[in-house]
Amino acid sequence: YLIESIGDVDLSSIKSVNASRFRDHLIAKGLASTSIRRVLSSVKAIYNLASKELGIANPNPFSGIFIPEDNAASERLPVPLDAIRLIQHECFQVDDPQRWLIAIISDTGMRLSEAAGLLTEDIKLDADVPHITLRKHPWRSLKTASSERDIPLVGSAYEAAIRIVDVGHKYAFARYCDETKCNANSASAALNKWLKQRIPEGCVIHSFRHSLRDRLRAVERPSDSIDAIGGWTTAGIGHKYGSGYDLAVKYRWMKMLER
């Protein structure tokens, strides 16, 4: 992103005007304000480290950059079911790891970073209920405590999981993940570019997560059970008691999405 915006320039020559141009470049690429903050935070940290190593005393030009708010969260739309089915079909026609990532998200509702940061061993195909064990890893944290969960594999997610396990790489999506980091920003840019011509305006890769919630509502699943599958935080006190929903129960609900 940075080199695209300002070129491959000497670190000491980067000024606040370059940082502002970089921000404008990210906005033009369609990134939400939260994503822009995340990218700028990473670049700022890299600049701090590199300037110390090289003895550059200039103030960090990426500090204090204004980032306008947007309405991306409220305007983000679910992907219609007919579009989901067409995309899933095309994913297996192309049949590469990037398309498997889309397919696995489309029928699990995982956040992009959750899926991109998986180990292949997190995929449990030989269990009584095929599922993904979603846990924190050193290279990828989880958003909330409720994000840690077991997700049944059905439909296109199951088909993608078979292919990932057959490849046998340590990381499910090695293009975006290694032992030091999970590059969800890079994955987001690439996948949204491919999806742009295939989904309605206002939809992005994260929209599959919104769609899953709507699809589970359509088969009359209780709200707290939907939260358990998607890793959303459930409001109220009652959800803190008991052991939650059994994986086999969640699997039966998820199988309804194949109809």
Which ranges hold each PLM region?
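N-terminal DNA-binding recognition helix of tyrosine site-specific recombinases/integrases
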Residues: 1, 9-20, 28-63, 111-113
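Basic, Lys/Arg- and aromatic-enriched nucleic-acid-binding interface segment
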Residues: 33, 37-39, 57, 61-118, ...
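Short, charged phosphate-coordinating catalytic segments
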Residues: 48-59, 105-129, 223-228
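Catalytic-site neighborhood detector that most strongly recognizes the C-terminal catalytic loop/helix
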Residues: 78, 158, 178-179, 230-259
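C-terminal catalytic core of tyrosine-transesterase DNA break-rejoin enzymes
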Residues: 103, 107, 207-233
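Conserved tyrosine-mediated DNA breakage-rejoining catalytic core shared by Y-recombinases
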Residues: 117-160, 236
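Short, polar N-cap/turn motifs at the start of nucleic acid-interacting alpha helices
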Residues: 123-129, 201-202, 221-242
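Active-site/catalytic core of tyrosine-dependent DNA strand-transfer enzymes
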Residues: 154-201
